[in-house]
Amino acid sequence: VDDVICNTLGAFIGSTSLLIARAIEKSRERVRHTNMTLTTTETQFLHIAKAAISGGDLPAEKVDWPAIFTLANQQKLLPILFEAARATPAAGENAALFAVTKQQVIGQVLNQTVRSAEFADLYRKLRSAGLHPIVVKGQLCSRLYPLKDHRISADDLYISDAEFMACHEQLLANGLTTDTPVDELATADEVSYTKNGSPLYIELHRHLFDSSEDAHDELNHFFTDLKPIEVDGFSTMPPHEHLLYLLLHAYKHFVRSGIGLRQFCDIGLWAWEYHDEIDWQRLHEQCESVHAATFAAAAFRIARDYLGIEFDLPAPWSDAVDAEPLLHDSLCGGVYGSNDLTRLHSSTVTLNAVKASRTGAKSSVLRTVFPKREYLERRYPYLKKRPYLLPVAWVQRIAHYASEKQSGTDNSASGSIKLGKERIELMKRYGIMD
């Protein structure tokens, strides 16, 4: 270990000098993201999505269907959009493209159908074992869509700390496996599970939001005293709390690297279905207390104006917020901002800035390049047992960025910092930061 430290610290010092110089150079640049308007393809995509979700006519003008289907796939909305598009004259005019896309859609829907059935069966077994997991998102949102298995998603379970390990053991007993090391199970906020030969994918949550993230831990207190209800055989949050969770879950991912259009669909359909069971005044106060009220108002506007989901938005909510920049960012980023590595890496910049805004501290480029140990523990598990190896992790992270740049992909560290700064301006627009 001592040799590793010595060798690595030498590289670390050299890398630090270069990065500080680069940070100074970049700080002089005043590049800002000015084009936050929707492109023609994005506008057409939204028109088709609105028709698919809420009914109505498809665009009369010429549509770039390969681009539309690519965007739909990135947004995990391909089956939903294809269902609306396949009955149009365009299907005959683009027969080869529609035939290939149809096979892709059939595969996705069949996978989702199997996933849904296996999850329902597994959930019954967990309840029979005396456990009380709460279902969030997933099938509870899917049932609100015209065709529920056309909404492609995994499944999430929220369970008390007291039952977490027992639930883990039951999942293993039912053939699921996890990559999370055994010594991390006792403290992990969430653990992911898959099943060999099955499309089943489950995230088991001890906390709904990462308790180690200063920017998100404050969200957990809303869900500490839930009174679950039964919906379609699943134990879940009451409608008000579930809508709050959908909004804050979207907010969390927006702050990190981005969210997709499907999250706005979920939010809108939930608000429409359970409108009279929502305490809209309290919801606004809750969102406002965590700097999420303007973001939530934009989410509601997207659902109503761009997706055609009709529901009243009582005072003090306002629909005057400009939602187009948020929409553009969502369509560029894909589901959870996963379209490219640059966007994913930029989360270090945005999270650092949000944390700084909460504490009154100043956001730092160096903190972005050299983040705290807690941020790196998931990627570099050895930090949990050997926190003094943090400089080693920094160097490994820098080397990882360098290898990505050499591979020819546009996801360098400087690119991530630039995108992060652009997204910080977007967060200021929606009141997340001052």
Q: Where do the language-model regions lie?
A:
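Acidic Asp/Glu-based divalent-cation binding sites
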Residues: 3, 155-156
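Alpha-helical transmembrane segments that form the membrane-embedded catalytic/substrate-binding core
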Residues: 1-18
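Conserved NTP-donor binding/palm subdomain of two-metal-ion nucleotidyltransferases/polymerases, i.e.
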Residues: 31-153, 159-434
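Membrane-interfacial segments
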Residues: 21, 25-30
